[in-house]
Curated annotation (Swiss-Prot):
Disulfide bonds join C166-C180, C226-C237. The lineage of its organism: Eukaryota, Metazoa, Chordata, Craniata, Vertebrata. The record marks L289 as: Important for obstruction of the ion pore in the closed conformation. This is Glycine receptor subunit alpha-1. Keywords: Cell membrane, Cell projection, Chloride, Chloride channel, Disulfide bond, Glycoprotein, Ion channel, Ion transport, Ligand-gated ion channel, Membrane, Metal-binding, Postsynaptic cell membrane, Receptor, Signal, Synapse, Transmembrane, Transmembrane helix, Transport, Zinc. The channel pore is formed by pentameric assembly of the second transmembrane domain from all five subunits. In the absence of the extracellular domain, the channel is in a constitutively open conformation. Channel opening is effected by an outward rotation of the transmembrane domains that increases the diameter of the pore. It comes from Rattus norvegicus (Rat). Residues 273-277, 331-425 are cytoplasmic. The gene is Glra1.
Length: 457
């Protein structure tokens, strides 16, 4: 009986002990503060009752806000020489510190917020100084990111498509290297309030496999500062320079090789018989017109600039060679027909010669004498008073030398034809050699001497 009572006593004490412990835990749980909901936390952090004013920059009346920028290039293309601009699609990322947004009440180290919250915080007034057109992306939702860290750091990322101005120097076109810039500038805050700077690591990133149709995007990207001075103050500005080397493949196929073949085609006339005037003239005119069309086509996609481009020199020289080939046949034809003109002139002169003109004949001494032989009167018909005939009046008995016999028409024809053929033979060698020398100078000058260095840009 005694042992039973003792056991019941210990059991009762155990029940009372656990009951008291459970009661204390329940009281502690009821007295512990409840975790704050995300909505309550955001209202406390940047709501109306938080005292946060998005119209006032961080560190107001204090040091300027340092904004670190980074861009990621999704696509790069549509480089237009006529309008001198280029199109690019990027992620623009800005990071700065806003002490008013630092927190300890929430367990997460960072908060990814809805883009609608962007209107509730202060943001830098960044714009692109050389922008000609731009738009945001809203498919399927606003392509914007807002992230706030525990220490008050803010990350703002946005996807935009830009059309930026890119002044081009086309003197070496199509063997040129162009430098296109992207300038990021503050619109309203001077450097006393806001300073832009490039991110130390990976300030400019390019998507893997990014290729351009006519250019090679150089890996060297110059990151510079371009502080702007206006009447309203000194404004922060940073810029990125993209070096683009043009690929010649398209222009070799579409311009250089066709024009080269046209020039070579014009030389075929040197092997065509000089009497085949329709064939040689037709070939010459066709090549000239084709070369003119080719030259006009090369300028169609380029702006009207005041200086001479490399492609202009090539087209002009090719047109000159083609036109010279046509003029060469004109010279050949003229020389080959000279004997006919000379014979026609001689016949015309003999036809209009009057018998009275034979009264005077010029000997080698240039003395004029009457010639009575035209009237059937010999020298003995006229006697002077002293018995000396008139013909012997100059007191010399020497006879005039016989004139050199003139060449026959057939000999003259062969002479002029040989001269014309000689012009063709010289042209067969001279034209290709001259064009080869031009090519040597042209490619050496534009590919070696005047080759552009991106580091000197």
């Amino acid at each position: 009986m005694y042992s039973f009572n003792t056991l019941r006593f210990y059991l009762w004490e155990t029940i009372v002990f656990f009951s008291l412990a459970a009661s204390k835990e329940a009281d502690a749980a009821r007295s512990a503060p409840k975790p704050m909901s995300p909505s309550d936390f955001l209202d406390k952090l940047m709501g109306r009752t938080s005292g946060y004013d998005a119209r006032i920059r961080p560190n107001f009346k204090g040091p300027p806000v340092n904004v670190s920028c980074n861009i990621f290039i999704n696509s790069f293309g549509s480089i237009a020489e006529t309008t001198m601009d280029y199109r690019v699609n990027i992620f623009l990322r800005q990071q700065w510190n806003d002490p008013r947004l630092a927190y300890n009440e929430y367990p997460d180290d960072s908060l990814d917020l809805d883009p609608s919250m962007l209107d509730s915080i202060w943001k830098p007034d960044l714009f692109f100084a050389n922008e000609k057109g731009a738009h945001f992306h809203e498919i399927t939702t606003d392509n914007k990111l807002l992230r706030i860290s525990r220490n008050g750091n803010v990350l703002y990322s946005i996807r935009i498509t830009l059309t930026l101005a890119c002044p081009m120097d086309l003197k070496n076109f199509p063997m040129d290297v162009q430098t296109c810039i992207m300038q990021l500038e503050s619109f309203g805050y001077t450097m006393n309030d806001l300073i832009f700077e490039w991110q130390e690591q990976g300030a400019v990133q390019v998507a893997d496999g990014l290729t351009l149709p006519q250019f090679i995007l150089k890996e060297e990207k110059d990151l510079r500062y371009c502080t702007k001075h206006y009447n309203t103050g000194k404004f922060t500005c940073i810029e990125a320079r993209f070096h683009l080397e043009r690929q010649m493949g398209y222009y070799l196929i579409q311009m250089y090789i066709p024009s080269l073949l046209i020039v070579i085609l014009s030389w075929i006339s040197f092997w065509i018989n000089m009497d085949a005037a329709p064939a040689r003239v037709g070939l010459g005119i066709t090549t000239v017109l084709t070369m003119t069309t080719q030259s006009s086509g090369s300028r169609a996609s380029l702006p009207k600039v005041s200086y001479v481009k490399a492609i202009d020199i090539w087209m002009a020289v090719c047109l000159l060679f083609v036109f010279s080939a046509l003029l060469e046949y004109a010279a050949v034809n003229f020389v080959s027909r000279q004997h006919k003109e000379l014979l026609r002139f001689r016949r015309k002169r003999r036809h209009h010669k009057s018998p009275m003109l034979n009264l005077f004949q010029d000997d080698e001494g240039g003395e004029g004498r009457f010639n009575f032989s035209a009237y059937g009167m010999g020298p003995a018909c006229l006697q002077a008073k002293d018995g000396i005939s008139v013909k012997g009046a100059n007191n010399n008995n020497t006879t005039n030398p016989a004139p050199a016999p003139s060449k026959s028409p057939e000999e003259m024809r062969k002479l002029f034809i040989q001269r014309a053929k000689k012009i063709d033979k010289i042209s067969r060698i001279g034209f290709p050699m001259a064009f080869l020398i031009f090519n040597m100078f042209y490619w050496i000058i534009y590919k070696i001497v005047r080759r552009e260095d991106v580091h000197n840009k």
